[in-house]
Amino acid sequence: AGAVVGYFAHKYKENPPVMVVCEASAADCLYRSAVQADGNLVNVTGDLQTIMAGLACGEGNTIGWDILKNHVTVFASCPDWMSAKATRIYANPLENDPHIISGESGSVPLGLAYTALHDEDAKDLKEALKLDENSNILVISTEGDTDPVRYREIVWDGLYGTTESLSKDFFYNNMIL
């Protein structure tokens, strides 16, 4: 995340895009670090159980954190259902959109964008992301279906369906001064 954010922050110095870091809520160290707002990293310990196994680290990279804390607009702590929903969206495209096989860790940015656009409880997030009908959204998935059995359970069987409400504080707008 630090390398991608650093690239876009450097390339578009005068008008940087809105940049978001999505984490599994069970291991949301960067989100917690941003909320703490003292510039230091917070480690998450204990049960880091999540379907987003690639994001279940609980510890941020100190070099990357320096870039992220200064350039990321929103840090999001995302529930598993948000990732699962996006995995299904990628697998079942509309009209001429391509079919994409994305694992759970790679799907969560699309899940956050979809939630911001379609969930009334996420209207503050939509505002923080400056999303409207003219927005262009780039989501980056860095993972295929690393667990084919789990992927099929999510896509075919509806594992981790949307059954929870969003927590009021599931995202942090890092750019509020």
Predicted features by range, described:
Residues 59-129:
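Active-site-adjacent helical/loop segments in soluble small-molecule enzymes
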Residues 1-70, 120, 125-171:
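Glycine-rich phosphate/pyrophosphate-binding loop at beta-loop-alpha junctions
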Residues 174:
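Short acidic/glycine-rich loops and adjacent helix/strand connectors
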